[in-house]
């Protein structure tokens, strides 16, 4: 499958029975063949010993408006691919990969249909990999565990330089010299665990998905019912990093607003007292968490056209 402008190609294969995918940009590899699949509790992984049962292609080209965003209206234009698979060995479980190719990236997700037996699905982790074609320069936010404030410095390190035990937050920005800038992230998370990334093994350019564990059952990440769909796994792609900022790819992958009437929503700039703490210049009161400071901030916002406090 290719993007509407033909620059991006996504290929899904079952070489040797293992479900895999690869991505190229302008004819150059971005992601080498990378493993797909789900690791299930008390069951073999879902994604090995698979064969393609059917393939369906389509396209989307629509526009919509949003209360706030980078551009308005937003155009949602992509080519779509749905690959239905089934195991070649018993119990012949089924899996569908739904994918989209945009001019600014690709996305895919897992769909697990009813299997005809128990409809509960218990996911330990995903087998999803991102095998970068080069030892790219990355700019990760390294987290100490799955419960953090997400406040730390972004680093500059090659893929092979990421410690195998480091937990990488998304989005992850990477520069593949001579090929593209990419950002790995996710979209449409609903009734599913958040995804992080970890370095596969030392000296490898492969990153693997890590799902946040459940608090009540730490050995599991997702407990839900079939039919089930995962969030989108997103690879944003551009020749320049600024194009990633301009992209509407993630919002296009998210579902439409559940709020039918958005006319009452008035977006605007907002001040927040934590931004400046208790600091205020040339005032006749003691700055701090007090009424005088809040009134000072409100007056500042009024004078400078800042709508909210």
Question: What residue ranges belong to the model's regions?
Answer:
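N-terminal accessory beta-strand-rich subdomains and adjacent acidic, glycine-rich linkers
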Residues: 1-257
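An acidic-aromatic substrate-binding cleft motif
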Residues: 225-308
